[in-house]
A protein has these predicted regions:
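Long, contiguous binding/interaction regions
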Residues: 1-3, 7-42, 50-120
Length: 120
């Protein structure tokens, strides 16, 4: 399974245009999570696709959309965990093995300072 992360402008119709590219290529999206992100007037889209070749075939078409700021295909072979953590002053992205991410989250005392927004 391939995980694709997009940073887009938070505007009406963006999801329709992004998903239209998957429809044109006949690519089935297994899961999708969308939400506002740490940057003002922007949103993050995280989706999963079963076939890496199909995921690679649609990336350039998605990058060409005006509303898309960034597209990243997450390398699953590294078995990394990604989490967006929201603190009072902003958001940070923690990357590492599952054990490393767990250790960082536990050290940060999330119940006091951090709210987990999305985790893959």
């Amino acid at each position: 399974m391939e995980v694709m992360m997009l940073l887009v402008y938070d505007q009406p119709g963006v999801m329709q245009r992004v998903m239209g590219e998957f429809n044109r290529k006949r690519i089935n999206v297994e899961t999708i999570v969308v939400g506002k992100c740490e940057q003002r007037e922007k949103a993050r889209i995280v989706l999963s696709i079963m076939d890496k070749e199909k995921a690679m075939s649609v990336i350039e078409h998605i990058r060409a959309l005006q509303e898309v700021i960034e597209v990243e295909l997450v390398d699953q072979s590294r078995h990394e965990a990604y989490a967006l953590l929201s603190a009072k002053e902003g958001i940070c992205r923690v990357t590492g093995t599952v054990e490393e991410v767990d250790a960082i989250v536990n050290k940060s005392q999330p119940e006091k300072y951090v709210q987990t927004m999305n985790a893959i």
